[in-house]
Amino acid sequence: MHRLPSLMQTIRSILQVTILLIPSFNLVKAENVIISEIMADNESTLEDGHGNYSDWIEIKNPNPVNFNLAGYFLTDDQSNLRKWIFPDQTIISPNGYLIVFATGQEDSNKTDPQGNPHTNF
């Protein structure tokens, strides 16, 4: 009969440790990003990496973790929702921003010399 209480005490100890550890893990799930600003007909506000004043879209990551935009799309055409796909490993830092230039002249690697993404519209 002494083995049963000993086993029960062991199980109780394991459960107590498990219950104490669960709240200590910081499991953060990234939510969606936000299109926070759009500049159409840019003539003097912000230059792209080629020195041109192109239209641009600002995307904000309100999450406390990095957000990878790989697999996401931007478009200016409701009939073509996958018109421009973000390059792989397009990461926005926690609470950070990304400017995407809508030049219609997508660079071969989708970014300009300064690393700014450029769309094909």
Positions of PLM-derived features:
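C-terminal segment of classical bacterial N-terminal signal peptides
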Residues: L21-K29
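Short, intrinsically disordered low-complexity segments
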Residues: M1-H2, I11, N109, P117
